[in-house]
Amino acid sequence: MTLPSIAIIGRPNVGKSTLVNRLCQSNDAIVFDKPGVTRDRTYQNASWGGKEFQVVDTGGLVFEDDSEFLPEIRTQVFLALEEASIALFVVDGNQGVTTGDLSIAKWLRNSDCKTIVAVNKCESLSLGISMASEFWKLGLGEPYPVSAIHGSGTGDLLDLVIDELPKDFDVEDKEDKVMMSIIGRPNVGKSSLLNAICGEKRAIVSDISGTTTDSIDTLIKKNSHLWKIVDTAGIRRKKNVKYGTEFFGINRAFKSIDRSDVCVLVIDAIDGVTDQDQKLAGRIEEQGRACVIVVNKWDLVEKNNSTIYQVEKELRSKLYFLHWSKMIFISALTGQRVENIFEHALNAVTQHRMRVTTSVVNEVLKEALGWKSPPTKRSGKQGRLYYGTQVKNQPPTFTLFVNDPKLFGITYRRYIEKQIRLNLGFEGSPIILLWRGKQKRDLEKETSKKNINIIQKD
């Protein structure tokens, strides 16, 4: 179950980390009387009134200065707000309303996140109410006086937070859905593809790059499965992206990749694979997501009997990160082969979730060793592959126990991966091979305990 999160936001040195420690009843957040101590966003679990949630501590937010780490801190704060259910805007009651507070308030008013203003450093109850009243001018509703250091007012603040948390935040996680994200550069036809999949105009489509600025979620039933399809904002080069709706949309797109069961990477058949396409492919591979490569606008390509083979060869040479992905050629405009996406996506998800018994893994490894022995170094020392086992899925991950991982070069490692794929499948899914050195004495104890036969002995 994913817990709702509360983002703690404010200028440097207003007491955000102290308030985090108070709300979470911990001392995990570093507190020091100097601006800029917190840079990255950090997460802590908390509970109040029988409800659990996450508290996200962020660095001091400054819009008027780009020195040192301030731009990076801004990015972290923006990310925290994007995933938050509530923003807790912390201000300094002793200093009153500053220009920095006004800048942050303006930004928060333009966001979709519910915001609560916490006026910190109100150590005196009677003075606190007076100090807090000044912050009505921020335009974010009633300000609440608190003292993070003494704890006064924090209970009332938590009561308010609990009342504002979504009541059904965990419903989605209880439903059995396949989450499929449509990923790609701007204007490759992602929204057209979503419309073709849904059979209706679900997303705005135009020739203007960047029409979709946010992730659009759609639930549909296909082949007895419930699919949650996410049409993401087009992802451009980082240097071309400014803060605002596009920034938030792109970060949602990256989060969609990370949370997806399967990604549909859309490539423009006319433009081919660009540098940005390669970066997206790398992100999918890095996150270990299942993937289907969809080449859109195939109806616009002049072709003969061999065109599809030539184009696929060229595209795969540039998308080598995803050599294991199925590639299909479609037209979102005409609907050509769009229905095939579900078949291949479901197969990729199934392969991504698959588990293989240790005995079957070792049968495959034994056969692979029979065809090609591990290499021998100039020193005369030869690699020994003792046994392997699958340790997890999503993505499928195998640990291979050997005498010395350094004796197994990249060529032989690729050979073993190829043999696993040839015998066990995993089309549409990455697999991870972890090569672990094992002492002979420890090996014998472990294999006898688990009743595993050693494939290759010293």
Swiss-Prot record:
Binding site for GTP 2: 184-191, 231-235, 296-299
GO MF term set: GTP binding; ribosome binding
Domain EngA-type G intervals: 4-169, 178-353
InterPro entries: G_ENGA, GTP-bd, GTPase_Der, KH_dom-like, KH_dom-like_a/b, P-loop_NTPase, Small_GTP-bd
Keywords for this protein: GTP-binding, Nucleotide-binding, Repeat, Ribosome biogenesis
GO biological process, one term: ribosome biogenesis
Binding positions for GTP 1 per the UniProt entry: 10-17, 57-61, 120-123
Residue intervals passing through the bilayer: none
The KH-like domain, residue ranges: 354-439
Described purpose of this protein according to its UniProt entry: GTPase that plays an essential role in the late steps of ribosome biogenesis.
Family according to the record: Belongs to the TRAFAC class TrmE-Era-EngA-EngB-Septin-like GTPase superfamily. EngA (Der) GTPase family.
Subunit (UniProt): Associates with the 50S ribosomal subunit.
Name of this chain's protein: GTPase Der
Source organism: Prochlorococcus marinus (strain MIT 9515)
